[in-house]
């Protein structure tokens, strides 16, 4: 969606406090989001 996985913390690739790099799917309770600093990347974030 339009959510940003790492807009509330450090960059997900270097300090995954708000998300993790997506490997094709998101774990249960997580949502797929765009990376705030890397528009072409996707990652997963815990649903709020």
From Swiss-Prot:
It is found in: Secreted; Nematocyst. The modification Lysine amide is found at residue 48. Its main location: secreted. One of its GO terms (biological process) is regulation of signal transduction. One of its GO terms (cellular component) is extracellular region. Disulfide bonds join 3-43, 5-33, 26-44. Gene3D superfamilies: Anthopleurin-A. It comes from the Eukaryota. Delta-SHTX-Hcr1f (RTX-VI) may be the result of post-translational modification of delta-SHTX-Hcr1a (RTX-III), which would consist of Arg-13 cleavage. Keywords: Amidation, Disulfide bond, Ion channel impairing toxin, Nematocyst, Neurotoxin, Secreted, Toxin, Voltage-gated sodium channel impairing toxin. One of its GO terms (molecular function) is toxin activity. InterPro entries: Anenome_toxin, Myo_ane_neurotoxin_sf. A synonymy between H.magnifica and R.crispa is controversial. Belongs to the sea anemone sodium channel inhibitory toxin family. Type II subfamily. This is Delta-stichotoxin-Hcr1a. The lineage of its organism: Eukaryota, Metazoa, Cnidaria, Anthozoa, Hexacorallia.
């Amino acid at each position: 969606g339009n959510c940003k996985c790492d807009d509330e913390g450090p960059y997900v690739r270097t300090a995954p406090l708000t998300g993790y790099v997506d490997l094709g799917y998101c774990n249960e309770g997580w949502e797929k989001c765009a990376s705030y600093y890397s528009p072409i990347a996707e990652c997963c974030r815990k649903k709020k």
